[in-house]
């Protein structure tokens, strides 16, 4: 319901890399699961309403790490590799990486 409401106003939702947001089970806290979150969001809202909202907070110390394969900003590309693996086009990945958010900020 919230995703649809944001879609209907032309907004975007950023996927969050914090392991507790990705999955309650530690072994499922992965870049692949994060991509599945994005796929669900795209199914509900359309990929033009999905963005990166990673919130890398590893500098806060233990307990604030990202999910496996996305522990810090140097691994952000793993999310996009996973999006490609599950069928997102190059144009959709580029939109999620930057274009969707830039559109809303304009």
Where are these predicted regions, by residue range?
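Active-site glycine- and acidic-residue-rich loops that bind
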Residues: 21-36
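Short basic/hydrophobic patches in alpha-helices and adjacent helix-turn junctions
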Residues: 40-44, 66, 78-86
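Mid-to-C-terminal alpha-helical segments outside catalytic/metal-binding sites
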Residues: 71-106
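Short, catalytically relevant binding-site loops at active-site mouths
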Residues: 19-22, 102
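Short acidic/histidine-rich active-site segments
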Residues: 15-17, 45-69
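Histidine/acidic residue-rich metal-binding segments in metalloenzymes
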Residues: 1-11, 32-49
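Glycine-rich tight-turn/loop motif centered on a GG-T
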Residues: 1, 26-28, 68-69
């Amino acid at each position: 319901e919230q995703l649809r409401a944001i879609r209907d106003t032309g907004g975007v939702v950023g996927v969050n890399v914090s392991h507790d947001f990705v999955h309650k089970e530690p072994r499922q806290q992965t870049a692949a699961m994060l991509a599945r979150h994005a796929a669900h969001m795209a199914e509900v809202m359309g990929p033009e309403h999905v963005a990166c909202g990673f919130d890398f907070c590893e500098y806060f110390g233990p307990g604030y790490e990202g999910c496996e394969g996305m522990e810090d900003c140097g691994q952000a590309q793993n999310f996009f590799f996973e999006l490609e693996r599950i069928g997102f086009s190059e144009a959709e990945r580029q939109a999620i990486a930057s274009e969707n958010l830039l559109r809303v900020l304009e």
